[in-house]
Amino acid sequence: MNPLILIILLTTLILGTMMVVTSSHWLLAWIGFEMNMMAFIPIMMKNPTPRATEASTKYLLTQATASALLMMAVIINLMHSGQWTITKLFNPTASTLMTVALAIKLGLAPFHFWVPEVTQGIPLTTGLILLTWQKLAPLSILYQISPSINLHLMLIMSLLSILMGGWGGLNQTQLRKIMAYSSIAHMGWMTAILLYNPTLTLLNLLIYITMTFTMFMLFIQNSTTTTLSLSQTWNKMPVITTLTMLTLLSMGGLPPLSGFMPKWMIIQELTKNDMLIVPTFMAITALLNLYFYMRLTYSTALTLFPSTNNMKMKWQFNSTKRTPLLPTAIVISTMLLPLTPMLSILL
């Protein structure tokens, strides 16, 4: 793709998201969503392979459906209240339709089926954008309309997302699909606490984006897309392999790494609100995620696949491209747990 066209598309993508995040009018938010979608689809087809075309088509169909539902909810709300303001969503039907539309855009269960397939069909860099930047716009709208969202509907979708995110990733060998199912589970944790403590959702989002960015950057450094290829990097880049292992365990929520902090704070907040069954279910289903991350860690750093003698440790390691953001991202992804007491006071 022409670099100039790519810059224009990325600028439009950023502007579309910023328009959604900063607008208080439904029409401007809808236009922002459409700008974002129409800029992202050509980026997905940067390498015009059949898989990329299929992924782009699936993404277009799901996002167009979600946008149609969103506009339908806005029109119903407009007919009942005469309001275009985002925060004034009073009609229950409009609120339910809006929640479903945003759940489709986020990839929450039971509308999650498109996320693994689309992520698998696109390159790692585009997958990183899909699983991080593309979550900002729908979550910002959910944050604004959180007082009028149906609690039971949101909790059911959140719990289903955590369950499906763990369940779906169990038998995967493709790293992009594993990251997609992990994204579904993390979205479930974020939306579960949204109605009780929206600020905690933002903290969880920040940590999730940092961990996902770190993970994808490590995959890009290693040029790996499968479990097998990841397990064969120890003799070329031992330091990168070790960091990959730590980040994987952090994404699974294993203490004392950063990924444990948002889970701990969310369970604590739900318990304060006299909810016991929901956080118990969330903690148990989070073990599914932790299991497949630990299995991935085990196959990456602690075992050797059957191989030839050429797989022995090399005397000279591959030189890696300098990425200034990666060390900072790794520190945030693994060492934030000591800040928990301070953050719990602030939140």
UniProtKB/Swiss-Prot annotation:
Top-rank lineage group of the source organism: Eukaryota
UniProt keyword 4Fe-4S, yes or no: no
Topology class, membrane: Multi-pass membrane protein
Disulphide bonds in the chain: none
Main location: mitochondrion
Keywords per UniProt: Electron transport, Membrane, Mitochondrion, Mitochondrion inner membrane, NAD, Respiratory chain, Translocase, Transmembrane, Transmembrane helix, Transport, Ubiquinone
GO biological process: mitochondrial electron transport, NADH to ubiquinone; mitochondrial respiratory chain complex I assembly
Intracellular or extracellular location(s): Mitochondrion inner membrane
Molecular function GO terms recorded: NADH dehydrogenase (ubiquinone) activity
Record field: transmembrane: 1-21, 25-45, 59-79, 96-116, 122-142, 149-169, 178-198, 200-220, 237-257, 274-294, 325-345
EC numbers for this chain: 7.1.1.2
GO cellular component, one term: mitochondrial inner membrane
Annotated Pfam families: NADH_dehy_S2_C, Proton_antipo_M
Catalytic activity: a ubiquinone + NADH + 5 H(+)(in) = a ubiquinol + NAD(+) + 4 H(+)(out)
Keyword Coiled coil tagged: no
InterPro entries registered for this protein in UniProt: Complex_I_Subunit_2, NADH_DH_su2_C, NADH_UbQ_OxRdtase_chain2, ND/Mrp_TM
Homology family: Belongs to the complex I subunit 2 family.
Function as written in the Swiss-Prot or TrEMBL entry: Core subunit of the mitochondrial membrane respiratory chain NADH dehydrogenase (Complex I) which catalyzes electron transfer from NADH through the respiratory chain, using ubiquinone as an electron acceptor. Essential for the catalytic activity and assembly of complex I.
Subunit text: Core subunit of respiratory chain NADH dehydrogenase (Complex I) which is composed of 45 different subunits. Interacts with TMEM242.
Protein name listed in UniProt: NADH-ubiquinone oxidoreductase chain 2
Species name: Balaenoptera physalus
Gene: MT-ND2
